[in-house]
Curated annotation (Swiss-Prot):
Taxonomic superkingdom: Eukaryota
Composition-biased stretches (Basic and acidic residues): 17-28
The UniProt record lists the keyword rRNA-binding: no
Descriptive protein name: Aquaporin NIP1-1
Induction of expression: By abscisic acid (ABA).
Segments for region (Disordered): 1-28
Gene designation per UniProt: NIP1-1
Subcellular locations according to the entry: Membrane
GO cellular component: membrane
Residues spanning the signal sequence: none
Family: Belongs to the MIP/aquaporin (TC 1.A.8) family. NIP (TC 1.A.8.12) subfamily.
Length: 284
């Protein structure tokens, strides 16, 4: 009997070790699936995010810079407001297309700003930025091939006035953009389904405001991609420093006023409108 008890205890102990090992294995798989693993072992979901960022940035830059190039080559047939609308719509549709996969950053400044606020893992920042740069460069290269490589139709961004003026303007409009993104995409009290519409509308407004002065980049990849293809690096630092500083400041500004993580319904339980809605739901 004693031998039988020892055997059963050994068996139970072995199964316990196996269960713990299986649990640890599942945790490691989940850890890697979230892209949090160390080293170069990228998980399939993380690779999917990178591909989504490449495609999203490509189509965004292709549509926006394509509108700029066509407007230049066809004597302004699209018009400046038309170009602004194209940029806004391009951002909106791509947010809805791949936002649920990668978060739809399409912008190294946005990725970096999220990381500084601990809303994006730092170790994924280089891969995201590289994907965004690749997408933007490929899009600019495609436009260069389509329009015969003519330098007079440069779809990049150049200051119309002084570098300081464009720097300040890029800081302000990127601050505005990142503030909106933080509100609609990271706050659980916001209506997430409207994120694409809100961000696209913000892009449209910013292009209308700053387009004639700085080109309304708001995105280092948007400026660096065409600059590398066209070989035009004049004042490129403006479109790196301004958007990065503006995005980080905008993200932190919203982070400061984010006083709670509770949903809106829990915060405003005393509101008469929500009370009436609750009564209607309970009565039905």
């Amino acid at each position: 009997m004693a031998g039988g008890d020892n055997n059963s205890q050994t068996t139970n102990g072995g199964s316990g070790h196996e269960q713990r090992a299986m649990e640890e294995g599942r945790k490691q798989e989940e850890f890697a699936a979230d892209g949090q693993g160390c080293g170069l072992a990228f998980s399939v979901p993380f690779i999917q995010k990178i591909i989504a960022e490449i495609f999203g940035t490509y189509f965004l830059i292709f549509a926006g810079c394509g509108a700029v190039t066509i407007n230049q080559s066809k004597n302004g047939q699209i018009t400046f407001p038309g170009v602004a609308i194209v940029w806004g719509l391009a951002v909106m549709v791509m947010v809805y297309a791949v936002g649920h996969i990668s978060g739809a950053h399409f912008n190294p400044a946005v990725t970096l700003a999220f990381a500084t606020c601990r809303r994006f893992p730092w170790r994924q920042v280089p891969a995201y930025a590289a994907a965004q740069m690749l997408g933007a460069t490929l899009a600019a290269g495609t436009l260069r091939l389509m329009f015969g490589g003519r330098h007079e139709h440069f779809p990049g961004t150049l200051p119309a006035g002084s570098d300081v003026q464009s720097l300040v303007l890029e800081f302000i409009i990127t601050f505005y953009l990142m503030f909106v993104i933080s509100g609609v995409a990271t706050d659980n009290r916001a209506i997430g389904e409207l994120a694409g519409l809100a961000v696209g509308a913000t892009i449209l407004l910013n292009v209308l405001i700053a387009g004639p002065i700085s080109g309304a980049s708001m995105n280092p990849a948007r400026s660096l991609g065409p600059a590398m293809i066209g070989g035009e690096y004049r004042s490129i630092w403006v479109y790196i420093v301004g958007p990065v500083a503006g995005a980080v400041a905008g993200a932190w500004a919203y982070n400061i006023i984010r006083f709670t993580n509770k949903p809106l319904r829990e915060i405003t339980k005393s509101g008469s409108f929500l009370k009436s809605m609750n009564r209607m739901n309970s009565s039905t």
